Amino acid sequence: MADDTGTEEGLGCSGWFCVEAIVDKTTENAISDDEDENVDDSGLDLVDFVDNSTVIHTKQVHAQALLNKQQAHADQEAVQALKRKLLGSPYESPVSDSQHSIDNELSPRLGGLTLCRGSQGAKRRLFQSLENRDSGYGYSEVEVQQTQVEHGHGAVHGTMGNGGAVGSELGVQENEEGSTTSTPTTRVVELLKCKNLHATLLGKFKELFGVSFGDLVRQFKSDKSSCTDWVIAAFGVNHSIAEGFNTLIKADSLYTHIQWLTCTWGMVLLMLIRFKCGKNRTTVSKGLSKLLNIPTNQLLIEPPRLQSVAAAIYWFRSGISNASIVTGDTPEWIQRQTILEHCFADAQFNLTEMVQWAYDNDITEDSDIAYEYAQRADRDSNAAAFLKSNCQAKYVKDCGVMCRHYKKAQMRRMSMGAWIKHRSAKIGDSGDWKPIVKFIRYQQIDFLAFMSAFKKFLHNIPKKSCLVLIGPPNTGKSQFGMSLINFLAGTVISFVNSHSHFWLQPLDSAKIAMLDDATPPCWTYLDIYLRNLLDGNPCSIDRKHKALTVVKCPPLLITSNTDIRTNDKWKYLYSRVSLFEFPNPFPLDTNGNPVYELNDKNWKSFFQRLWSSLEFQESEDEEDYGETGQTFRCVPGTVVRTV
């Protein structure tokens, strides 16, 4: 083996070493003086040789945009450094939700120690701001470090660590700008974060308008209750919609009172609207939600207080100011409580006026009196005073009792002819008497014999004052009798109540009576106990909570499927009744309507046509019956004093 060049043996050294010479390049260029071969090459100069950051291709690069980008990046790094400086205990879990305690503030290392292991599972948050929302892609404790900074209002915001700081500069800048601006979306999210949204809206309303919403409205528990007047408070309305809402609602309303104020949630509208027809809360909320472009849970909708003077004055005073837009006629409940003449018109309740009204309108039932008179409160001062009273039930009962007394006394003073005219005056003149006559002839009854018995029946002649209609079922006996009783405002008694001592009490206050569908036990009862009643003679009647009274039985009409002539045990009733048989079924047309109409108008025409045949005399002094003289008055007159 040949000797290698540069290797010397001896002097206690042996081995190989490399000798490198500095030579010129083949290009024969001199080596640069800047290169220092004595410095160790660590490769740091090749770190930025490959740029992994996102390259944004633009057509033209502006110097100002580049400067802004650099400044934003520098600001971001300064904020990141400040956040790291204010970070709590380094031993606290980054996913922990525990609050910083006083010990943690004094000693982060001591505050990080716990006796029990807390829950490491992250809680799901229903409402999360856009900047804190993360898709979760690639999330791990190693790759992403979540830091928390506690702001003055107590909210905790998370920021990203070192990862992604270089490649997402533009996205970080947009998130920083979005977190400082307040948009309608963020305001709605903040509103929805409230645990009790209704209470929050009520509190904001009182803060803005200086008056409680409950002081202006009365509560409807049901959303289906209808009302024409509604008070609405709308939150978060756009400014352009608020200004044009008066025009949008004009087509559906008769009166509008609109005022608005500005708050952090947008425009807040307070409205008093009278719609053209009654609407419930659900209908109003759906309609206004579409017009105002807001959800229904941002609306407070209740009817106004109609009897509150303070509420009426609020609407009146705010309506005359320049802060409200008012269109239409002012509701009467505001005028009644604010205008001076209406205040003077308020008077105490007068029972006689209520009784006079019930008498004139022929209303004798307590429930009808209470309902009808309460509806007159908006145009009758006495009815308004009635509603304000705490004794409404007593007044209604007293009014009904007095009205029935007056009606009963008026009826007793009238003869049968006057009573028929009195009843006919309340019915129209478009009737026809022929269907009644045709129906009687259809039942194979001699019309002259019927008119003779009917005349004695109406005149209440003894032993001729009971008219009996017998025959098979469905022959029109009850239809014929009920139509006559309804025209003459008679009463009906039922044998089913015969076990009571008071079942004949209605005969005391009737001009004519009817006993429908008398069965054999009923005929036996009449034969044993009520022979004098069928005679038309005075008899004693027991009345509930009253003493016995002696009355003359009014004309009594009886219908039955039993022919008393076929049984001798009722022979003592033969001479006390006038009996007519209806053998034929009641006729109906193809549509199921009666062929012969038996109604009030036809009965009126029947009595007018056959008035002379019934031998009702024309009274010369009809004033005794209240027909042509002055009408009955129970209200004391007022004396007109001359000045």
Curated annotation (Swiss-Prot):
Segments carrying motif Nuclear localization signal: 83-85
PROSITE patterns: SF3_HELICASE_1
Broadest EC class assigned to this enzyme: isomerase
Name recorded for this polypeptide: Replication protein E1
Catalytic activity: Couples ATP hydrolysis with the unwinding of duplex DNA by translocating in the 3'-5' direction; ATP + H2O = ADP + phosphate + H(+)
Posttranslational modification: Phosphorylated. Sumoylated.
Molecular function (Gene Ontology), one example: DNA binding
Region (DNA-binding region): 180-346
Disordered: annotated span: 155-184
UniProt source species: Human papillomavirus 42
Function field: ATP-dependent DNA 3'-5' helicase required for initiation of viral DNA replication. It forms a complex with the viral E2 protein. The E1-E2 complex binds to the replication origin which contains binding sites for both proteins. During the initial step, a dimer of E1 interacts with a dimer of protein E2 leading to a complex that binds the viral origin of replication with high specificity. Then, a second dimer of E1 displaces the E2 dimer in an ATP-dependent manner to form the E1 tetramer.
Keywords: ATP-binding, DNA replication, DNA-binding, Early protein, Helicase, Host nucleus, Hydrolase, Isomerase, Isopeptide bond, Nucleotide-binding, Phosphoprotein, Ubl conjugation
Enzyme Commission number(s) of this protein: 5.6.2.4
